[in-house]
């Protein structure tokens, strides 16, 4: 999750010890073993570090260049949950990150941030723009014991169990529900300028925040739009570089 003190506050082993000093050398070894192929160093930021750009830059200083930092998704009363004040800080941080990335690119030391990867000339087809990741229909999560779920974030939620690897999909009702979950399934999305970038958002995030896969995770929505704004700004700036 970036800085040692941030990572070790939550990424602990069974004995409660922080993991930073053990995982960083292993991450470096993994990236080296990739032999130049792509990878992503992914972290999560919480109420403890809304200034998450410091963690992104820390990863970059360690030598990692393909990075992703995701906002935490949890119940509003969870100590890790982002507050309304945090959201304003995070939005400012996204701008700081975009400007820093442009500077690094000019200096010949670029880094990639997953959420700023935006193709304005090609990009996904209209079906993908509407349907998004395809959880529950185009792909599923398979548990070690053979059960099928719409995606890994639903594993353990029995009502979302689709079937198993022996009998296949037997819960057609749930699959149909996911098939109809798209950018046009939510009233809140009807007039949103970003709906064909987010495809209605993550079904799992919506469910965990609202109790329905057709709900809208408002905080995530707000941050997503800010990320797209920054990504578009970067595209414009890169045209002049």
Residue ranges and their predicted role:
Residues 145-147, 184-241:
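Radical SAM enzyme core and accessory elements
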Residues 138-153:
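Active-site and channel-lining beta-strand-loop segments
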């Amino acid at each position: 999750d970036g800085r040692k003190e941030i990572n070790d506050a939550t990424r602990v082993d069974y004995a409660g010890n922080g993991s930073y000093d053990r995982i960083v050398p292993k991450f470096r070894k993994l990236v080296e073993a990739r032999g130049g192929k792509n990878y992503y160093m992914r972290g999560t930021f919480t109420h403890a570090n809304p200034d998450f750009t410091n963690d992104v830059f820390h990863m970059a200083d360690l030598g990692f260049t393909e990075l992703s930092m995701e906002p935490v998704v949890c119940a509003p009363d969870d100590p890790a949950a982002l507050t309304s004040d945090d959201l304003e800080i995070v939005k400012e941080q996204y701008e700081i990150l975009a400007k820093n990335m442009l500077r690094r690119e000019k200096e010949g030391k670029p880094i990639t941030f997953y959420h700023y990867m935006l193709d304005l000339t090609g990009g996904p087809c209209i079906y993908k723009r509407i349907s998004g990741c395809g959880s529950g229909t185009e792909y599923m999560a398979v548990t070690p014991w053979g059960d099928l779920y719409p995606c890994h974030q639903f594993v353990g939620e029995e009502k979302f169990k689709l079937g198993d690897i022996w009998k296949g999909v037997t819960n057609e009702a749930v699959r149909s529900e996911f098939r109809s979950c798209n950018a046009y399934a939510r009233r809140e999305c009807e007039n949103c300028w970003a709906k064909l970038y987010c495809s209605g958002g993550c079904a799992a995030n919506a469910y965990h925040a609202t109790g329905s896969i057709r709900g809208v995770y408002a905080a995530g929505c707000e941050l997503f739009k800010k990320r797209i704004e920054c990504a578009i700004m970067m595209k414009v700036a890169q045209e002049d570089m």
